[in-house]
């Protein structure tokens, strides 16, 4: 059963993901981390792993926000059908 919380969370996620400031910050951060990873000394395994972990977490955050957005859309559709 869909909840209002899912609908609200989905809307908030969509607002965040579509926010130009958030998009710029996310892209800049990912670009910075990728650049740091590429520029790191091949022997500096710790630095390379830290960059890899940070990029992976950043991508997972984006994926999770997308999941919230999609779940909210589905919940909203369920509410709409229940009202008919």
Residues covered by each model-derived region:
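N-terminal acidic leader/helix
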Residues: 2-36
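Serine/threonine-rich low-complexity intrinsically disordered regions
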Residues: 3, 44, 74-75
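Short linear motifs in intrinsically disordered/low-complexity regions
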Residues: 9, 45, 78-81
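Residue-level signal for functionally critical sites in structured catalytic/ligand-binding pockets
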Residues: 15, 47, 72
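Amphipathic, hydrophobic secondary-structure cores in small proteins
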Residues: 22-66
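Charged low-complexity stretches with an acidic bias
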Residues: 55-84
């Amino acid at each position: 059963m869909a909840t209002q919380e899912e609908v609200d969370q989905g809307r908030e996620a969509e607002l965040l993901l579509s926010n130009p400031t958030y998009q710029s910050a996310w892209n800049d951060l990912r670009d910075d981390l990728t650049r740091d990873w590429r520029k790191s000394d091949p022997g500096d395994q710790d630095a390379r792993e830290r960059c890899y972990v940070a990029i992976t977490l950043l991508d997972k955050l984006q994926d999770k926000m997308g999941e919230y957005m999609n779940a909210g859309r589905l919940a909203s559709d369920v509410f709409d059908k229940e009202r008919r």
